[in-house]
């Protein structure tokens, strides 16, 4: 089972989904795809709630970028797992979370106030430029690993267990292969 949301929800639908029962179990079995390996990180600028801007192509080093939304239940489940991953892999890869919420800081700031996610940035793309760069709107969550040159290594569509040892191995192995080192094992995500 693949747990995911689409980016096409209207504002009213987004608010309804955000109020969904949080006790609902989410299957964390995202799908790893290498179909877009080698593509450059999108030329998109995101903002944070304070108005700071970040051009994604200006980010240095390897990046694990997660496109999510507050109304996407699988995304919400993933956020604490990504926060833990960001802490564990600090200095190895930069974890960027980018919200696709249409209302931007109005809903993103309260989300971060509610959940303790000290290792995750609060980037937003309320115009959905990033989603459109991924061919008009991917399923959410979408997590893409980029190497130090800003080239895609792989992407995972749907919710994934970022707290697992295998998740850390997937990221580290992919980055070591990109750096020219031989991998120890084959990727375990299907």
Predicted regions and their residues:
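C-terminal motif of bacterial Sec signal peptides marking the signal peptidase cleavage site
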Residues: 2-4
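N-proximal helix/coil linker or "cap" segments that precede and/or mark the start of modular domains
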Residues: 6-43
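Non-globular targeting/processing and membrane-anchoring segments
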Residues: 6-7, 178-190
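Short active-site neighborhood of thiol/selenol oxidoreductases, capturing the structured segment around
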Residues: 54-76
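Alpha/beta-hydrolase fold active-site loops
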Residues: 62-63, 93, 141, 151
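Structural microenvironment flanking redox-active thiols in thiol-disulfide oxidoreductases
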Residues: 77-115, 126-133, 169, 184-189
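Thiol/disulfide oxidoreductase modules built on the thioredoxin-like
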Residues: 112-119, 124-176
